[in-house]
């Protein structure tokens, strides 16, 4: 998929967030990268680049204290090639991008992977 089209999917995923979450995104850049770097793989404890679809790097909002300020923005990286490697068709890519964007934004709001797994498990039970 062309980079421009993939970036548009990321923008659409952000635009599809509920307004209250969009308003609360503070001091965070969301970027598209082709592949994760070795450093990013190490931080995320992944051994293969196709396993890491997105990465949040920063200080979650729940950890920001009174002294938080004058800092570089948090960074959410969405990795295009690993997502494409896991999906066959454009609509699968779009769905996966939305899932990854929501997951990484949840980290920005302070949710850890264990909590996110529990939430996803509860969603599946309700279906």
Regions found by a protein language model. Give the residues of each.
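Catalytic glutamate of the conserved HExxH
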Residues: 100, 104-108
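Active-site rim/adjacent substrate-binding subdomains
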Residues: 1-96, 108-118, 123-126
